[in-house]
Amino acid sequence: MKHFFKRLFLIFICLAVLVAGVGMYIGNMAYEEFYDAPWDQILGIENHSRDVSTIRQWERERDWEPVRVNAPDGKILRGTYIENRRDSHKTVILIHGLYQNRTMCLPYMDEYRRLGYNILLIDLRGHGESEGDHTEWGISEVDDLLMWCQWLQNRDPQMTIGLHGISLGASMALLYAGSEYGQDLSFVVADSAYGNIISLGREKLWQAVGDKRAIWGYNLLDPFFQAAMFYHTHKMVSSLEPAQAVKRMKVPVLFLHGSEDELVPVKTARSLYDNCTSPKKEIHIFEGSPHAVGIETNQSEYMRVLSQFLEEDADSV
């Protein structure tokens, strides 16, 4: 009987090692697929990432300054700096969405310029003129934003910096604001941010397949995927979740979202707002607006809400 239990124990150990090995192999494949997946097709987003003809033309015609920084991993990141006509020490960094580039942020400039802000338009890595093959969902983007903030502060040591992001850019802004680097920001505007990219992927899988077995497989794979991510990046998936970042935020934040957003449900914005620890937080929902187009569908309302938030923030300083 003693030998039987010993053999049973050894069989159990062998099976556990085999399952773990297979799981890690599949988890590593899932990690690689996560980065190389055609997210434009999965999420139904048109890919305009590398079309920078408009921003280049505007740079030439308006004498805007093309700028660049080096990311910590050596990749070159590019942007456009637009100095306010006033002698201003405040700047907003405008951050575009997935498969877009800094051209997307042009409609957001006017209100900031009216309020006296310098403007820095940036291309996230893997977008526009910045190097990289694709987004890294926050693994490198937080450090990239630090490089841009340091560039601004080297240019003007008195500079105060705010972030305004749209969709993916909003989520990156929240990740930065919740990091150790982001505590000195003057404000964050998060327009149509997602809370958890893994959960968003799970929801899209359910919508596409409609089979609970796919979700079971997704959930079964999750711990191995997380282990593979930690092996490759030394970061946990939770570090890429704006839903966790807002729990560490101290800076003023304005959450914006469309009530008819079918990509990132409006409940996400409400959850981010509810869990945000900032002593000054606001939320505004644009009725009838789809994903990340509030500035088009509700332009005057968008500008009014933004201006009121920024002016209140300035008064509180």
Model-based region annotation:
Residues 260-264, 292-293:
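Acidic catalytic loop of the alpha/beta-hydrolase fold
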